[in-house]
Amino acid sequence: MIDLHTVRTAFSESYFSNTSTPSMRKLPLVARQAAAAGFVKLVEPQPVGQAELEQIHDRAYVESILTGIGPLSHCAFGYWSEDYRDGVLAINGGNLLAASLALDDGIAANVGQGFHHAAPRNGGGFCTFNGLALVASLHPDIEVFVLDCDEHGGDGTAEFTKILPNLFNFSICGTGMAAFEGNRSIVRRVPPRDEKQAHDYLNEALALIGERRPGLVIYQAGMDPHID
């Protein structure tokens, strides 16, 4: 039986970087509060390796992020630093750890950020590497179903569905920036404050999960509704 009060959750203090937005600065606070409340058991991940990243991302892009050399090193956040680089490597390693824990326990989490806008050759929108596609790449024998709920659609993840046959993307997003639709990419746009439509789309996604019976479901939780 799954104990929902002690979910094993990937987190490292190196997730922190003093970014211009709270995107990476907030992560230690979230992890500490969740642990103090007894909801999670924090587990230290290993940073993702260059070889693993190059399975899904262009080598020149990966090297640019690792070294800080070239304009691509700034494409996600508009700046580069060593703690930013170390943070995104740890966060993506956390996604791999969370996937393994979920396959063992039935549920797991990663106190991370910044995956779904990252495409094979570049990042963007505060997303550097696509840790969702990375999980699918390293678990080729199972279908990985991404349920993405964010104001912006998972356009980077949708790009990866073209090249990873075991990756499925279902984006529930706002009416602005959205992902493309394809054989394994579904997009449902929700008008502002239309709670009923949002619930209808969520039920559609859950029904599809029941039909497809993927080996792993990843909930990509957007932070756009959060104010404070």
Locations of regions flagged by a protein language model:
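HDAC/HDAC-like amidohydrolase catalytic core signature
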Residues: M1-D228
